[in-house]
Swiss-Prot record:
Keywords: Glycosidase, Hydrolase. The active site is at 203 (proton donor), 277 (nucleophile). Its EC number is 3.2.1.-. One of its GO terms (molecular function) is beta-galactosidase activity. The gene is Glb1l3. Belongs to the glycosyl hydrolase 35 family. This is Beta-galactosidase-1-like protein 3. The keyword S-adenosyl-L-methionine does not apply. Signal peptide: none annotated.
Length: 649
């Protein structure tokens, strides 16, 4: 069996045709599976042969990692099996996933590993299917999620330096690991599980602030019983700084770049090269264009990886969805939010559909597999349902009695510092600040990320991080000043994570005079809130309405609900909740124009639809069989066809 190594490649002896794929048992990924390796002693290891060429072994057998990323927390639990089977049927042998601390411990000391967050069930399902698993537990993960996966309550203490050996941060990490790692231990390879490697932190080379931090985390994993191969993950500029003794250094990249491999090989010439992230596409941001990457480029790059004997993981194989408020953001002179869809232009679409990339890769992998690839799992059908007439509504200020008890404070605090949720503050959503004012003037308020300002129930303007001053007109008597602030997703990388508190910061003043005596409402939009809202006195919705409001309607899904995509014509900005589940944000600045609605989240027949729209009421909600992730169509019409399909160009 011919194996090609990078030093050979770089000296000009790379294979020049796909004939190398025709040799029997070309790749070990199809031979070594969790069900076939019963007697386990060694696990995933690295070796060098007599010529000094390094390679991976699994239980002593040469092994190539052919991995794909699927994040369990971005996929409905009912579809985990479908996505993993499609990964295997494409020819992959390994699934990788991040573990989001901020979702598992939203409140300090209160852990959630249920439903879509059931990590153990996900890993065991992968084992049953026949896949190996690489876990990436952070504590920081980036992943384009809010605060890079760090819980927002860490921001309550301004002296807590994130991603360092700062006492407050490390104590929190230790308590989290004390709860998380025992769940991982029995899932490890040497204990009969499918986990063959565990990553230490994530891309620390681009952040590096504390030379002791990575070593501390490595020891934290080891002393709690992690026995499988440890690795780090950075781009070419960060591999040196982000590495740690005792862990394999892996690299992240957008394309096949010789310089990157040479740099990594010089660092650890006795170790095999592993591409921990080969980016199959990229994430989208609100107000930007939808990003795509050609299927042929992906196929050609993966062909090179395999020809050169490189193990790799494709990020993402299946991106899924940023359900709820979990999306992250970035900063480029202003805050930019990641969109709801995490389609990523990945190998498998957001809804789990096959793509051109999938079929090209499957053909490539099949040509070198020692056995036939599994048959393709069937596609999940999509449906078009009757339009949803949102016939009832409640203006924002009418729902205040259905929220949790408000907080009364002398001066406002950020959402993280609200004295709620057992001292953990508010992680996601919106906050409404109210106080009485008796004169107009120049209002100053430092808001993050965006705010609508009202006098009583009348909108008077907006604020954001770059616009902190608003002129309030002269008023008669005293009136209620209301400031509705939304967290649009905390920045998920860079030094800015340290100061990502949301809500109202610092003082609020009019003409320099400090405003006091605030009533503060938490709008975290949890399921319990929507249950209470069912008892509200909903009003008949007018044809048009300006301002933030909740709208109610019914989606009839028939007797056998299945997937669909929601299209919200003439709605501007808000969130959609189906039976109390938050599908995520919509925004008319694009590029995303539809929201993915998984069939398992629908009941037979009637389903409650609630839309929280911040700006202006739109028309009936429509459903489609295909998503619209960008602005234009092949037809140029900008409209779906008669079947409800809309193929973006």
């Amino acid at each position: 069996m011919a194996i090609f190594f990078l030093p050979t490649v770089l000296s000009g002896f790379a294979p020049h045709s796909e004939e190398v794929f025709k040799s029997p048992a070309r790749f070990s990924w199809s031979n070594l599976t969790p069900s076939e390796l019963k007697n386990r002693f060694v696990g995933l290891s690295t070796k060098t042969n007599a010529l000094g060429k390094a390679y991976f072994t699994l239980e002593g057998h040469k092994f190539m990692i052919v991995g794909g990323s699927i994040h369990y927390f971005r996929v409905p639990r009912e579809y985990w099996k479908d996505r993993l089977l499609k990964l295997q049927a494409c020819g992959f042998n390994t699934v990788t996933t991040y573990i989001p601390w901020n979702l598992h411990e939203q409140e300090r000391g209160k852990f959630d590993f249920s439903e879509i967050l059931d990590l153990e069930a996900y890993v065991l399902l992968a084992k049953t299917i026949g896949l190996w698993v690489i876990l990436r537990p952070g504590p920081y993960i980036c992943a384009e999620v809010d605060l890079g996966g760090l819980p927002s309550w860490l921001l309550r203490n301004p002296v807590t330096d994130l991603r360092t050996t700062n006492k407050g941060f490390i104590e929190a990490v230790d308590k989290y690991f004390d709860h998380l790692i025992p769940k991982i231990l029995p899932l490890q390879y040497r204990h009969g599980g499918p986990v063959i490697a565990v990553q230490v932190e994530n891309e620390y080379g681009s952040f590096q602030k504390d030379r002791n931090y990575m070593n501390y985390l490595k020891k934290a994993l080891l002393k709690r019983g992690i026995v499988e191969l440890l690795l780090t993950s950075d781009d070419k500029d960060g591999i040196q700084i982000g590495s740690v003794n005792g862990a394999l250094t892996t690299i992240n990249m957008n394309s096949f770049t010789k310089d990157s491999f040479i740099k990594l090989h010089k660092m650890q010439s006795d170790k095999p090269i592993m591409i921990m992230e080969y980016w199959t596409g990229w994430y989208d941001s609100w107000g930007s264009k939808h990003i795509e990457k050609s299927a042929e480029e992906i196929r050609h790059t993966v062909y090179k990886f395999i020809s050169y004997g490189l193990s790799f993981n494709m990020y993402m194989f299946h991106g899924g969805t940023n359900f709820g408020f979990i999306n992250g953001g970035r900063y480029e002179n202003h805050h930019i939010s990641v969109v709801t869809s995490y389609d990523y232009d990945a190998v498998l679409s957001e809804a789990g559909d096959y793509t051109e990339k999938y079929f090209k890769l499957r053909k490539l992998f099949a040509s070198g597999s020692a056995r036939p690839l599994p048959p393709l799992p069937p596609l999940i059908p999509k449906a078009i349902y009757p339009s949803v007439n949102l016939s009832f509504y409640l203006p924002l200020f009418d729902i205040l009695p259905y929220l949790n008890q408000p907080v009364m404070l002398h001066t406002p605090v950020t959402m993280e510092n609200l004295p709620i949720n057992n001292g953990s503050g508010q992680p996601f959503g919106l906050v409404l600040y109210e106080t009485s004012i008796c004169s107009g003037g120049s209002l100053f308020a430092s808001v993050h990320d965006s705010a609508q300002v009202f006098l009583n129930d009348q909108s008077i303007g907006i604020l954001d991080e770059n616009h902190e001053v608003l002129q309030i007109p002269k008023i008669q008597g005293c009136q209620l000043l209301r400031i509705l602030v939304e967290n649009q997703g905390r920045i998920n990388y860079s030094w800015r994570i340290q100061s990502e508190q949301k809500g109202l910061k610092e003082v609020v003043s009019i003409d320099g005079l400090l405003l006091t005596n605030f009533t503060i409402y938490s709008l975290d939009m949890k399921m319990s809130f929507f249950k209470r809202l069912r008892s509200a006195s909903w009003r008949l919705a007018p044809k048009t309405y300006n301002g933030p409001a909740f709208y109610w309607g019914i989606l009839n899904a028939g007797s056998s609900p299945t997937d669909t995509f929601l299209h919200l014509p003439n709605w501007h900005y808000g969130f959609v909740f189906i039976n109390g589940r938050n599908l995520g944000r919509y925004w008319d600045i694009g590029p995303q124009r539809t929201l993915y609605l998984p069939g398992p989240w629908l009941h037979p027949e009637d389903n409650e639809v609630i839309v929280f729209e911040k700006i202006e009421k739109g028309f009936d909600i429509q459903t489609r069989k295909k998503p619209q992730l960008q602005e234009c169509y092949e037809t140029g019409s900008g409209l779906p066809d008669a079947a409800g399909d809309a193929d973006p160009c």
